[in-house]
Regions:
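Acidic, surface-exposed loops and disordered segments
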Residues: 1-175
């Protein structure tokens, strides 16, 4: 089996991270993989925001927690010290798919580099808020973008989870 197929089969969502920061060189490689994701008509509309500043990461975590309805103090990013936020231009008819493909590439690249990842939702709600719109504006990002997801990144704290058995009857063949 090829290395790529093996990585697809063995990548798992991590929900317990060490506090050690992922090196910038590794983050750059992961981001590059995201930038090479397929996109509708090759438009490459998704953008990626890297967040490693602890204060901002914690602020986003609190907002995400509130949106998710959890008790104050819960960290929906499971302690991950780094995150890559994927947004896509709403004017593209394939923007959700394009952003989702970026997320997949980010997670596979992280796994290849020995870095744990987890897709964290609620980016859509975050960036629909005044906070999110002002944050994008502060970065010089203009236009109508929708948050697709956060790719939480860090080193696995504990055992790497095994893949559960695959469900049956999910493929139908027409020959």
């Amino acid at each position: 089996m090829s290395d790529v197929l093996n990585k697809m089969k063995t990548r798992r969502s991590i929900r317990k991270f060490k506090s050690d920061m992922v090196p910038q060189e590794a983050l750059d490689q992961i981001i590059e993989a995201g930038l090479y994701a397929a996109s509708g008509m090759g438009e490459q509309s998704p953008i990626i925001i890297q967040v490693t500043k602890k204060e901002l990461r914690d602020e986003i975590s609190k907002m995400n927690c509130k949106i998710g309805g959890w008790k104050e103090g819960f960290d929906p990013f499971y302690g991950a010290p780094a995150m890559l936020i994927v947004l896509a231009k709403k004017s593209r008819p394939t923007y959700i798919y394009d952003g989702s493909l970026v997320m997949g590439n980010l997670m596979l690249a992280a796994h290849e580099l020995g870095i744990g990842s987890c897709w964290i939702h609620r980016a859509k709600e975050e960036f629909e808020s005044d906070w999110g719109k002002n944050f994008l504006k502060s970065l010089g990002i203009e236009g109508e973008y929708e948050g697709i997801g956060h790719c939480a990144l860090g080193y696995v704290d504990g055992e790497y989870p095994a893949a559960p058995a695959r469900k049956e009857n999910r493929v139908f063949y027409v020959k």
